[in-house]
């Protein structure tokens, strides 16, 4: 931000304002993360059923909420009757968790850049990311590609740090 966030006098945005912006982005993340996890679990639980014959939707949702320990203050992000992602044939069937998993990969890969001696603008590391991960596309298993870039499996703690849930 210091490179371009300037007022009409050319003064750089104050660090205190940047800190407030960053803190605001992390507000309520515990709620939002729980809500996403609950929706992902509900999606998977629906797809574990062998048949939908005779299933009471409300009772099923209540049972899942109890099984996963969902507190009453946090409800499912979408009710099953209009949770189009999981039933609409959009390719997300039993895969709503993909949003969280993508965030894990995003935050973990970025953390590798942050830890680089050259910082996030490390051109050599960027080239490695491009060559070992991005350019390969679907030619190999995604985890194999990620590990070839990172040298390890993704660390989900990076997502939790990014959301301000852990230090």
Per-region residue spans from a language model:
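Cation-handling catalytic/transport regions enriched in His/Asp/Glu
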Residues: 1-167
